[in-house]
């Protein structure tokens, strides 16, 4: 179902199945396929040779580059053709050869992606992942199933993330990181094997986090990684330190929710 304005923006070689819903000013490039159950919001541009399968909803002003695969079946041997979905927000950039898969019934049956994210070429988002806003996944970075990637996190090129792992807000993973346990908010990791390497103070400063909050986060990092405290004791001390700091409180709440342990 398309508006008349949309029809002029669909290349004649593109295939749009009948139940797909395209808002105004959506552009579909040559040889792309838009399947049944796909909804695309206003101003979104889909390049050539893109495949989008439903149920998938895509918000406004996204840019999807050539040869990307959006809303494909999950790569899970337990998947048995159940109806599951992919939800993508607004203003995301999805570069060439990226793949974003639908969810599975073993979780919430949906993969969720927020707003203003950048997925560079050859990135992969597996089934049931939940991604926040303003995330960057550099070329070749891949998320296994059920990963949570919180807002403003950055994954360097070819970073691999184990299933069910949580990566906190404003965290940073260097190129080629192998992440097998949770990464607390604001923490930088890298190396072989991948280990913590301080806090992402530059990213915090760029996003307007105050010098006082950065000082508190740096002190919390030392409690977790430098003072030989049990994690539970470090969390208790961080909670006492947090006061009115939303950032440090977010770090405490994240650590209390950890189930796989944190990368050390």
Which residues does each PLM region occupy?
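Structural signal for interior beta-strand "rungs" in well-ordered beta-sheet cores
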Residues: 4, 9-190, 194-195
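Terminal amphipathic alpha-helical/low-complexity segments used for targeting or macromolecular assembly
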Residues: 1-13, 18, 24-25, 61, ...
């Amino acid at each position: 179902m398309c508006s008349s304005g949309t029809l002029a923006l669909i290349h004649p070689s593109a295939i749009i199945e009948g139940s797909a819903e395209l808002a105004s000013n959506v552009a579909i490039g040559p040889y792309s396929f838009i399947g049944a159950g796909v909804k695309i919001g206003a101003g979104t541009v889909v390049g050539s040779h893109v495949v989008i399968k439903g149920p998938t909803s895509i918000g406004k002003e996204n840019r999807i580059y050539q040869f990307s695969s959006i809303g494909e079946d999950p790569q899970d041997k337990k998947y048995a053709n159940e109806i599951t979905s992919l939800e993508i927000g607004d203003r995301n950039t999805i570069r060439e050869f990226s793949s974003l898969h639908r969810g599975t019934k073993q979780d919430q049956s949906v993969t969720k992606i927020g707003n203003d994210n950048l997925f560079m070429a050859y990135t992969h988002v597996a089934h049931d992942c939940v991604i926040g806003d303003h995330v960057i996944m550099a070329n070749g970075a891949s998320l296994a199933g059920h990963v949570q990637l919180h807002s403003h996190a950055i994954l360097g090129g070819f970073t691999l993330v184990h299933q069910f792992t949580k990566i906190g807000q404003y965290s940073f993973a260097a190129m080629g990181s192998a992440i097998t346990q949770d990464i607390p908010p604001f923490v930088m990791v890298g190396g072989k094997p991948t280990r913590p390497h301080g806090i992402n103070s530059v990213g915090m400063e760029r996003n307007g986090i105050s010098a006082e909050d950065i000082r508190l986060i740096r002190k919390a990092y030392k409690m977790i990684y430098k003072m030989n405290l049990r994690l539970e004791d470090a969390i208790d001390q961080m909670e006492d330190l947090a006061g009115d700091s939303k950032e440090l409180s977010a770090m405490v709440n994240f650590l209390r929710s950890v189930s796989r342990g944190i990368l050390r």
